[in-house]
């Protein structure tokens, strides 16, 4: 879509100089008609006193017992479900991958300290996996799955561990494979969901692989916590199959309890995920008071095709909600996160009237729209369950009941005011590391802890414990900029889809506007207009790139708005000859493609064009890494003059790295204040990140004419801005791909990170406003 400001930036006809270089005699496209800007329907700027502030992100692979030998940093460790000691100071999380629980000191929320781990092997059980934890008094109850893959004979136990010395003082056989645990508010009993989960690779008679029934059925264990732990005993609560059948549950003969929550009356709510049901149990007597279906929902305005496009015109028909996490809103309403596991999942969350079982409110497509607005849509899950809400917690903030909904695939927690359960109000979105599952409010300290389970060391994706603080007292230590720092506006009720922003350019016609583009993570290619006069910055236009009247997909790694109108794109190819400068008219149509000289293209490896800048008669480009024929660590900067079609090349000495598997390259180039600015980065993130910087290079006079076998003149560089402290200031994982920067017409320096479309990445986009370039950049 084109808008008035997009038109002004590209309105002029293409100058004869550029037309000659483009080898075309066609007239430049006329200025497109003015159209309305997209606007954001959400007020993102809550007062500091009314929002959460991210305090810290602690990667749990760093947590090990004091004095223990170093562990393999690449070994998988996760943080799935968390609890906290009654004083609110020690978080305890499950790590099923490493078969242990971990302890983290959060007395200073801005500086979590790992207190080590307790392996189940140390308790004498080498192959058992913790599924949940709950602290009560001086103890923590550790729910352990001992099934070991024998689905037909599930087993489990709950260990009672004294926190002070981490010794097990008691263990209770649960008689089945457990999932979650909850403690009553008065501390008198615990409820444990015994799921006896299905084997997704087993085929029941007459059914398909992974189907139910797969006996034995699940149940709930109630544990009386009166007296010393050695006196604690459990009581099994079975469900009435006939009642489940009458309620319309799927496969009532094989129920699979997933999650439990207890209200102030001692009622236990149980989600029966695969059966698409909810049960309510009297925690004191063990009587099953109610079973009802979670029902179905049809959802429209969502992306249901994994085709590389964020196409929100899709829908799903009436689909079982299949709730995972469940929580009480007061004593009369229940909230569920409708993840889905077998046949369903509706991409949102629902509030039920617990008395009638009727739906009081449903999120519809709003959770997915929230992901799209904030660049957290995961295209590779479009045909499955989209953002996949899984975790949920209910807390109270400033006297207001508040729901916290965790999106497992889009990596965020959404905050809602549920003072009126029939009309929740969205308040805030919190970024997390991948796979947030444990959502742990600590009301006594106005803290929130989120534990994330996805851990892929090879991709730099690490499981973590993230800490957020609510209110003014945590604002000063909160991450800056606050998330989201860039969002998209809505067009006809749907947000502009975006992500994987790998480029920035100033708008020559508007001092408060920038241009950016998505790379090959999404297609077809578009140039996005960004209004930086707002906070957060707002993507409010999307200009499709076309060729011969048809949309095209390009790996756009650089965008330069031409002073005379139109754009130049740096397009990276899978192979050297596919790297091109693409000249685009104001209406998005491709005017010309300019290939790199064959001598250069043939010397490229997997990385090529990564940045572009344009002034009145020159185009500058950055090649990400060295040519095969160039000295190690010397990348190239190129100068192209459209008037004569000539290329001149210069050398640029990259910083070095000693980290195995790491490399350093260029990601952006700009012309500013009579010099070239280049962005240099390594491929590391989080605590490992070392090189994220802008360097200044004086504009050179002479260089090498196209030749790849002639050593280029290496240009002296000078550090202009170390970006690593800016990226670390968010209090999240320092992002790997800082790939775009620009000095806007208002003189400010802006920087953006590429979130890789959430594939093998945590997906958080950081958009930095670093203030006036004259101050932000060293001379």
Question: Language-model features: where?
Answer:
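Bacterial N-terminal signal peptides that target proteins for export
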Residues: 2-10
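Bacterial lipoprotein signal-peptidase II cleavage site
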Residues: 23-30
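C-terminal motif of bacterial Sec signal peptides marking the signal peptidase cleavage site
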Residues: 18-21
């Amino acid at each position: 879509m084109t808008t008035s400001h997009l038109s002004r930036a590209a309105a002029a006809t293409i100058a004869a100089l550029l037309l000659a270089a483009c080898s075309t005699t066609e007239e430049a496209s006329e200025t497109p008609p003015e159209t309305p800007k997209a606007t954001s329907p959400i007020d993102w700027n809550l007062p500091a006193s009314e929002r959460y502030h991210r305090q810290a992100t602690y990667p749990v692979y760093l947590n090990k017992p004091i004095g223990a030998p170093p562990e393999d940093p690449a070994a998988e460790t996760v943080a799935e479900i968390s609890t906290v000691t009654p004083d609110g100071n020690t978080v305890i999380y499950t790590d099923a991958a490493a078969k242990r629980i971990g302890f983290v000191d959060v007395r200073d929320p801005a500086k979590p300290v790992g207190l080590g781990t307790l392996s189940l092997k140390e308790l004498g059980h080498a192959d058992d996996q913790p599924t949940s934890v709950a602290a009560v008094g001086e103890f923590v109850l550790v729910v352990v799955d001992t099934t070991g893959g024998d689905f037909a004979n599930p087993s489990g136990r709950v260990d009672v561990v004294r926190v002070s010395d981490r010794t097990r003082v008691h263990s209770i056989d649960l008689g089945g494979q457990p999932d979650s645990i909850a403690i009553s508010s008065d501390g008198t009993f615990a409820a444990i969901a015994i799921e006896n989960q299905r084997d997704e690779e087993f085929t029941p008679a007459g059914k398909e692989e992974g189907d139910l029934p797969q006996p034995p059925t699940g149940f709930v264990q109630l544990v009386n916590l009166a007296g010393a732990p050695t006196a604690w005993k459990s009581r099994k609560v079975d469900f009435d199959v006939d009642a489940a059948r009458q309620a319309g549950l799927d496969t009532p003969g094989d129920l699979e309890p997933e999650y439990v929550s207890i209200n102030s009356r001692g009622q236990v709510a149980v989600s029966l995920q695969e059966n698409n049901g909810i049960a309510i149990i009297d925690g004191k007597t063990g009587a099953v008071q109610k079973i009802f279906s979670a029902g179905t929902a049809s959802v429209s305005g969502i992306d249901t095709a994994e085709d590389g496009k964020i196409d929100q015109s899709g829908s799903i028909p009436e689909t079982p909600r299949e709730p995972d996490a469940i929580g009480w809103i007061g004593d009369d309403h229940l909230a569920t996160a409708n993840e889905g596991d077998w046949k369903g999942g509706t991409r949102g969350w629902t509030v039920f009237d617990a008395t009638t079982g009727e739906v009081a409110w449903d999120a519809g497509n709003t959770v997915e729209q929230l992901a799209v607005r904030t660049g957290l849509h995961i295209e590779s899950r479009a045909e499955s369950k989209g953002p996949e809400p899984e975790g949920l917690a209910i807390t109270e903030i400033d006297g207001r009941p508040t729901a916290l909904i965790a999106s497992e695939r889009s990596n965020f927690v959404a905050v809602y005011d549920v003072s009126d359960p029939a009309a929740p109000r969205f308040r805030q979105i919190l970024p997390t590391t991948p796979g947030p599952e444990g959502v742990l409010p600590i009301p006594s300290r106005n803290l929130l802890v989120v534990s994330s389970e996805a851990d892929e060391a090879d991709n730099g994706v690490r499981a973590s414990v993230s800490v957020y603080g609510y209110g003014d007292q945590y604002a000063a230590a909160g991450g800056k900029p606050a998330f989201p720092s860039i969002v998209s506006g809505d067009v006809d009720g749907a947000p502009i889809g975006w992500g994987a922003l790998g480029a920035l350019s100033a708008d020559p016609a508007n001092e408060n506007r920038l241009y950016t583009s998505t790379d090959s993570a999404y297609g077809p290619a578009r140039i996005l207009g960004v209004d930086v006069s707002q906070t957060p910055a707002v993507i409010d236009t999307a200009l499709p790139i076309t060729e011969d009247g048809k949309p095209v997909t390009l790996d756009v790694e650089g965008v330069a708005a031409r002073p005379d109108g139109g754009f130049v794109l740096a397009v990276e190819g899978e192979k050297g000859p596919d790297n091109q400068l693409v000249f685009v008219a104001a209406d998005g149509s491709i005017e010309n493609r300019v290939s790199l000289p064959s001598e250069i293209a043939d010397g490229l490896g997997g990385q090529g064009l990564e940045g572009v800048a344009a002034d009145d008669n020159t185009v500058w480009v950055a090649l990400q890494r060295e040519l095969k024929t160039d000295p190690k660590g010397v990348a190239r900067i190129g100068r192209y003059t459209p008037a004569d079609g000539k290329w001149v090349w210069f050398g640029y000495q990259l910083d070095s790295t000693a980290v195995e598997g790491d490399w350093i390259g260029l990601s952006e180039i700009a012309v500013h204040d009579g010099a070239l600015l280049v962005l240099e980065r390594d491929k590391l993130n989080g605590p490992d990140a070392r090189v994220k910087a802008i360097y200044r290079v004086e504009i050179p006079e002479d260089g090498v004419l196209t030749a790849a076998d002639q050593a280029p003149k290496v240009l002296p560089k000078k550090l202009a801005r170390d970006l690593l402290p800016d990226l670390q200031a968010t209090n999240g994982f320092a992002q790997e791909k800082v790939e775009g920067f620009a000095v806007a017409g208002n003189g400010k320096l802006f920087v953006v990170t590429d979130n890789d479309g959430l594939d093998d990445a945590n997906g958080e986009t950081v958009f930095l406003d670093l203030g006036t370039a004259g101050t932000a950049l060293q001379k």
